Regions:
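Active-site phosphate-binding and catalytic loops of NTP-dependent enzymes
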Residues: 34-37
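Short, solvent-exposed loop/turn elements at beta->coil junctions and helix N-caps
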Residues: 39-43
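Two-component histidine kinase transmitter core
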Residues: 31-32, 159
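Extended non-transmembrane interhelical loops and adjacent amphipathic helices
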Residues: 19-30, 50-54, 332
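Cytosolic ends of transmembrane helices, especially the final helix of ABC transmembrane type-1 domains
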Residues: 1-28
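ABC-type nucleotide-binding domain
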Residues: 45-361
Length: 361
């Protein structure tokens, strides 16, 4: 009788989990689609890419009803890379004076408009201010829950800021239509999503026009995946399976880069695009990304300092605030969180090299 009772307990758990999932799916289906063409500004051409954050704060809207099971399902999942790099760094953060990375905020809204309004949920971003000029690279670093992804998700208007002001080329970001922003912003995620279609279909997905083979091949060459595709028996007609299961992690990343190149966006969001691949593949992807980032305003989320050393501005986030900011050389010249991360990663790299050398002897 013991085993039937245990199976009954497991069945109850599975049914409860399934019921919660069903409720959340039905809520999602019932949601109204956000208006894509709501906005006063829709320029004929691409944006220049001049982005400015002025005392920006953001908090997620709480769900209308949350029970204990849904709370558990909504708990944030922290990645291994977050723990590997940032855990164990003893650095107490005391909120100090306001950090302004672009000097005087001429034309900013009145102080009342910049104050964080009362919110039923805690703010995940607080008093974020910086400026990114066209073609510059902004790097974001910080541990799990520091607000890196939340910050970049404001740019395509997946969410709107709770307080403060974000401008694109001098116009408030929320005055642009979501369709215009998303047509001109390219995203390469840590785990790119590929559809169960051919490689060619995945590269051309979202372009919105008929794309000749020459353009597809040129994008694949720039992403360093063309030769790999031709090695498959069916070439660009190769079916990749759901989520690209037939491709390696590096191949999926390069297909996503080719897709973004074909879209030719003015603004790029790179969400830790090389954290889940080996060192050799990382070097190949990094080379492809350099071509993708050229003359484009780029935001890079990264955990490895080697990936952000050449950035025009590095923002170190902690608990939704800018803890440090500056170039790599400027941050290395001052004690702080960034220097601790650098020293830790350098020790890890030295230990790895010694292990490799020892195994080869």
């Amino acid at each position: 009788i013991i085993w039937p009772m245990r199976n009954l307990g497991r069945l109850i758990v599975e049914m409860s989990t399934g019921l919660v999932s069903y409720q959340r799916v039905t809520k999602l289906i019932a949601e109204e689609r956000e208006p894509l063409d709501e906005g006063d500004v829709q320029p004929a051409g691409a944006p220049q890419g001049h982005i400015r954050f002025d005392h920006v704060a953001f908090a997620y809207e709480p769900p209308p009803e949350v029970n204990s099971n849904e709370e558990a399902a909504d708990a944030p999942v922290e990645t291994l890379s977050d723990h590997r790099v940032f855990d164990g760094l003893a650095f107490d953060f005391e909120p100090g004076p306001e950090i302004d990375t672009h000097g005087d905020m001429a034309g900013a809204p009145d102080g009342a408009a910049l104050a964080e309004p009362a919110s039923p949920t805690p703010h995940v971003l607080r008093d974020i201010s910086f400026e990114c000029r066209p073609g510059q690279v902004i790097a974001l670093m910080g541990g799990a829950g520091s607000g890196k992804t939340s910050l970049v998700n404001l740019l395509p208007r997946f969410y709107d800021a709770t307080a403060g002001l974000i401008t694109l080329d001098g116009q408030p970001l929320n005055s642009y239509t979501r369709r215009y922003l998303r047509q001109n912003i390219g995203i390469v995620e840590q785990e790119p999503f590929l559809f169960s279609r051919s490689i060619r279909d995945n590269i051309t997905y979202g372009v919105g026009r008929v794309v000749p083979d020459e353009e597809v091949h040129a994008a694949a060459r720039a992403a360093a995946i063309h030769d790999g595709i031709l090695s498959f028996p069916e070439g660009y007609s190769t079916m990749v399976g759901e989520k690209g299961v037939t491709l390696s992690g590096g191949q999926k990343q390069r297909v996503a880069i080719a897709r973004t190149l074909l879209k030719n966006p003015r603004i790029l969001l790179l969400d830790d695009a090389t954290s889940s691949v080996d060192s050799e593949t990382e070097a190949e992807i990094h080379q492809a990304l350099q071509g993708l980032m050229e003359n484009r305003t780029t935001f890079v989320i990264a955990h490895r300092i080697q990936s952000v050393m050449d950035a025009d501005l590095i923002l170190v986030l902690k608990d939704g605030r800018v803890l440090q900011h500056g170039t790599h050389d400027e941050l290395m010249a001052q004690p702080g969180f960034y220097r601790q991360i650098y020293d830790l990663q350098a020790r890890m790299e030295d230990e790895l090299q010694r292990e490799i050398a020892g195994s080869n002897e």
